[in-house]
Amino acid sequence: MTEMNSEFPSTPTFARLPIRLQRDAMARKGLVVDLHLILRQGVRILFGLRRNTGFSDGMYHLPVGHLEDEETISAGAIREAKEELGIDIHPADLQLVHVMHQRSGRLSLFFEVRKWSGDLVNAEPDKCESLDWIPADRLPDNIVPYAAVALQFIRDSENVGTYGWD
């Protein structure tokens, strides 16, 4: 019997594919899968100010990490929340709101989260200078560019987008 990914029954088709097919599709394309968390508190979104990572240091970015081998997308997002923010998220509280295919060989998944348990902490202070709640309608200029584009897609209710192909 094929294992089904039933954790997101109302999300885009990819999330409903059997897990084996998800992995096969990503491996064939050689894509790195990034898992982004859009934690919302009212009109504010949680961002981390990056440092000492070698990628976009000094810029704000959503909490993000990579999907690991033999891990479902929801399990990866939940793991990243615990590792980076010290919080627990129930799978039912993850909402896949956007999928972005980047020309750089990345498939970026964006999960909106409005409910979690535990106190938010900067669990990776060596990579993150601070955690800041920023109003969604007043984002600063120093946000990682593809994340800013993804947030615009989400505001425009576009659940699939690309970056770097133009």
Report each predicted region and the residues it spans.
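Acidic, metal-coordinating catalytic segment for phosphate/diphosphate chemistry
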Residues: 2-36
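Short connector loops at helix/strand junctions that flank enzyme active sites
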Residues: 30-34, 40, 57, 62, ...
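Active-site-adjacent beta-strand/loop module that shapes the phosphate/pyrophosphate-binding cleft
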Residues: 41, 99-121, 132, 136, ...
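A short coil-to-beta-strand element that immediately follows conserved catalytic motifs
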Residues: 88-98
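Nudix hydrolase/Nudix homology domain
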Residues: 2-3, 125-166
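Acidic pyrophosphate-coordinating catalytic loop
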Residues: 25-31, 53, 98-110
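Conserved Nudix-box catalytic region and its N-terminal flanking loop in Nudix hydrolases
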Residues: 41-83
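General beta-strand recognition
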Residues: 44-46, 95, 108
